[in-house]
Amino acid sequence: TPDLAWQRFSLAIQANKQKLATYLVRFLAKKDRQLATSYKKAHTRPSEIKRISRYKTQNPHVRDIVLHGIKRLARHQPEEALSTFRQYDEIHSFDPSASAETFVYIGKHLSYEDDTSDLLENLPIDPSDYPELVEARIRKALRDDDWSEVLILINLLPEKFQHQPGWRYWKARV
């Protein structure tokens, strides 16, 4: 079926299996082949996703492309990815869990950058629901020698994470 073909194509792109994705294009419906080209382009040149006018169509496949492209962009330009995704978030009705997952992904990559603390604090998700994001923010606070932030963030972690030896050490050290 066309939906199954798109699903497999999407999984191939996400797994970075370009040859498999190219092979799977032949099984897509004719109307989806142009979107497949856009998907590949968003994968290989993530900055392409910043052209918002190209991806305004309300379509589940377009939303797949946008989410994937934003994640790819976040790997090297997390600040750009965040601002671009906020614009898309106003246009498209993303699934809340997919949207939150994308914000977490962007947040983790923002934590590797300097001077992004304000952006991290203003992500539209509750950090206590995403321990991997909190851990990334703790590591950033440690790099920045922001001890009060380290303590605040460690306390945001769920109990089972707080009792891990590494976080117990830093909590005691602070």
Predicted stretch roles:
Residues 42, 50-52:
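Non-catalytic extracellular/periplasmic "stalk"
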Residues 9-10, 70, 155:
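Amphipathic alpha-helical segments within well-ordered protein domains
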Residues 1-7, 15-20, 27-36, 45-48, ...:
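Generic helix N-cap/helix-start motif at coil->alpha-helix transitions
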Residues 24-25, 85-86, 120-123, 154-155:
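Inward-facing hydrophobic residues that define packing positions of alpha-helical scaffold repeats
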Residues 84-88, 106-109, 143, 153:
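Alpha-helical structural signal with a strong bias for long, charge-/Ser/Thr/Gly-rich
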Residues 54, 78-93:
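Non-catalytic all-alpha helical scaffold/repeat segments
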